[in-house]
């Protein structure tokens, strides 16, 4: 079996940013998260990085994955996305580190074709390479192939794919592997003499936070907190207003207000104008997570007329 065929068999195809499982999930609602997206894209498109790693963190439902999916899509369109991996706790192949390096190497071979022969040679030299440690795999399948082509004329160091995007690291099923992946990615960036960079998102779990607090990872990373750095209320308001507008345009209500409508009104101390509605629906949490949004939208669908 050829080296690239062996590699393909080790790839977690459903973890790619443009796989059906990932790309079908919500991205940032148009006009929301503008400041965060602008910040990440401006950082990613720079020609040099003071800190080559950004850790995007926040609690469940704060929008980390939607932001990562959107950024991956935008960078892919600009030809800057090198590789991505979207972990998911219940997704086969996406919930462990077993296929992580192979999946990254596969994408590198596709977006920088000059690396493919070197990756294939590494697999041919050691057909058991995928049973080695993650670091040994990274050296053979990521670092060495990139180093081998640095002096080739086709490798433009200013206009080339150079951003890794990793999402949901906390959903990897082995906490030790979570920290191992962080260490490996940091070492990969240190071994490459030209600028490459990483945006990684996770919940601020104890082990992950600890890894960012010390050592080389602390020195080469910056942090972007979704629960402190950015006020999400305007984004929530825009999302709700747009969704309410869609419902109003597409599905006129029957008799107003109707019993269920009265039930919704009863949640508010006064008629549900935008400000009071917003306050009543999100005052239980600093962040209005996606679960709450789903519940709200499902309830609103029951208010629509039939037929």
Where do the PLM segments sit?
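Conserved NB-ARC/NACHT P-loop NTPase core of NLR-like innate immune receptors
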Residues: 1-307
């Amino acid at each position: 079996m050829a080296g690239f065929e062996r590699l393909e068999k080790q790839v977690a195809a459903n973890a790619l940013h443009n796989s059906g499982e990932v790309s079908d999930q919500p991205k940032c609602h148009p006009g929301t998260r503008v400041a965060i997206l602008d910040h990440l894209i401006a950082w990613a498109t720079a020609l040099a990085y003071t800190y080559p790693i950004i850790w995007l963190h926040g609690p469940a439902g704060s929008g980390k994955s939607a932001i990562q999916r959107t950024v991956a899509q935008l960078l892919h369109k600009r030809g800057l996305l090198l590789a991505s991996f979207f972990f998911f706790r219940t997704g086969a192949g996406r919930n462990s580190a077993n296929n992580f390096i192979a999946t990254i190497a596969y994408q590198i071979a596709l977006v920088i074709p000059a690396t493919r022969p070197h990756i294939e040679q590494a697999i041919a030299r050691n057909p058991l390479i995928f049973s080695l440690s993650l670091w040994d795999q990274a050296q053979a399948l990521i670092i060495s192939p990139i180093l081998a082509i640095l002096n080739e004329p086709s490798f433009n160091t200013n206009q080339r794919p150079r951003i890794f995007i990793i999402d949901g690291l906390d959903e990897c099923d082995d906490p030790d592997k979570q920290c191992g992946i962080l260490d490996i990615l940091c070492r990969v960036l240190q071994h490459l003499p030209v600028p490459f960079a990483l945006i990684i998102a996770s919940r601020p779990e104890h082990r992950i936070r600890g890894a960012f607090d010390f050592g080389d990872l602390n020195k080469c990373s910056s942090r972007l907190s979704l629960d402190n750095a950015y006020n999400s209320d305007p984004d929530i308001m825009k999302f709700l207003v747009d969704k309410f507008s869609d419902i109003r345009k597409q599905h006129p209500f029957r008799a107003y207000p109707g019993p269920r409508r009265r039930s919704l009104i009863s949640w508010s101390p006064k008629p549900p104008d935008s400000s009071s509605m917003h306050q009543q629906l999100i005052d239980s949490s600093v962040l209005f997570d996606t679960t709450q949004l789903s519940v709200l939208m499902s309830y609103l669908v029951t208010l629509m007329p039939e037929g």
